[in-house]
């Protein structure tokens, strides 16, 4: 936003149903008032991603830029590497009962179910590292041609985009959310959900 590549309006999805997310109409491009050092500011700190403590200005989740995932924050041109997209629900875990992986949603009333598709499941747009966008209708895919896999203890396993799989050996799995706190370790990061 600060460099003028995108307007702040793009940060609000037209399909977003969370009333706490709104366009930042007062984004300051020069010497923002909320900056610690206004002359050296590289962005407007009043642009807020956290919609859990008042109004936020960002609808979209992005891959956590940390650990093994950090290398994926570049032009890898991989068609299965999700990098940004509509927010998803918080995932409690992934179940392999019956021989098929299924994501277990923590809150069955997640606001993210209201944004697209049927009201009892998640659907949304996901942008990938090769610059294409797909409309995705599942939280966990099963086709290696279109869905990313990570190296788990049991071998290659399909990745759930909104879950940080604990058995990921290299910490390269795709984990997407809006993050309000970062740190040197994955445990120091705070993801928010609705």
Which sequence ranges carry the predicted segments?
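Short, well-structured segments within or immediately adjacent to enzyme catalytic domains
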Residues: 1-194
């Amino acid at each position: 936003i600060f460099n003028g590549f995108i307007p702040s309006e793009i940060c609000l999805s037209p399909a977003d149903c969370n009333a706490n997310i709104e366009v930042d109409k007062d984004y300051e491009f020069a010497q923002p008032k909320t900056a610690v050092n206004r002359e050296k500011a590289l962005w407007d700190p009043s642009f807020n991603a956290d919609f859990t403590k008042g109004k936020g200005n960002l609808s979209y989740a992005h891959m956590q830029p940390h650990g093994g995932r950090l290398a994926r924050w570049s032009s890898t041109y991989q068609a299965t590497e999700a990098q940004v997209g509509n927010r998803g629900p918080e995932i409690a875990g992934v179940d392999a009962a019956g021989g098929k992986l299924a994501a277990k949603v923590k809150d069955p009333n997640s606001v993210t179910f209201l944004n697209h598709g049927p009201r009892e499941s998640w659907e949304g747009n996901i942008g990938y590292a090769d610059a294409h966008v797909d409309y995705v209708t599942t939280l966990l895919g099963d086709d290696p041609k279109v869905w990313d896999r990570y190296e788990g203890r049991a071998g290659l396993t399909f990745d759930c985009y909104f879950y940080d799989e604990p058995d990921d050996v290299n910490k390269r799995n795709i984990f997407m959310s809006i993050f309000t706190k970062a740190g040197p370790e994955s445990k120091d990061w705070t993801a928010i959900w609705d």
